[in-house]
Amino acid sequence: MNDINMRDQADKLRNLARKSAVDSSFDTPCPRMIVVGGGKEGIGTSTLAVNFAIEARRQEQRVVLVDAHPTRGDVAKLCHVDHPWTLSDVLTGQCSMIEGIASGPHGLQILSGVQKKPLSEDLTEFTYRRFFNQLTRLNDQADLIIVDIGEAASDTATYHWSAADLVCLVTT
């Protein structure tokens, strides 16, 4: 049963990657974007994303770390950041991208993930286009955007795959 389940997850990831390779709808220039995702919960995507971000800061890059995990945000906890705004607030228009970003350790800029309730699966394509449009406006404050999407086999992950310059899949 587990082998079948793992194959199903891997198939979903491959299909998402294929679909995003064809979809080039996010053609507005923005800082280089790395998306980190995995095949299942709890395999360390947040830890890897935070470490990528810290290493990029050591190389004097300006980094925005976005926690886009749809069900729980761990990046802020790992970085000991407490900020009133989250990704949910940016997506629903309750705050701007700039307002949502908090200062973190090592000079990281962090957009915290969801804390109380999961992201709604019915967020529209327009919502994500608006979100990525706001990311493009970060040219003045970011050289690199690192996005932790957690379990990568969600419908919303497609938007992140499509916008990424580089995708890092964490496997077990």
Regions found by a protein language model. Give the residues of each.
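Short acidic, S/G/P-rich loop/turn micro-motifs used as interaction or catalytic elements
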Residues: 43, 117-119, 153
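Extreme N-terminal, non-catalytic leader segments
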Residues: 1-39, 96
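Short loop/turn elements that form and flank the Walker-type P-loop nucleotide-binding site
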Residues: 29-30, 59, 104-105, 140-142, ...
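Short gly/ser/thr-rich secondary-structure transition/capping motifs
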Residues: 17-20, 91-94, 127-129, 147-151
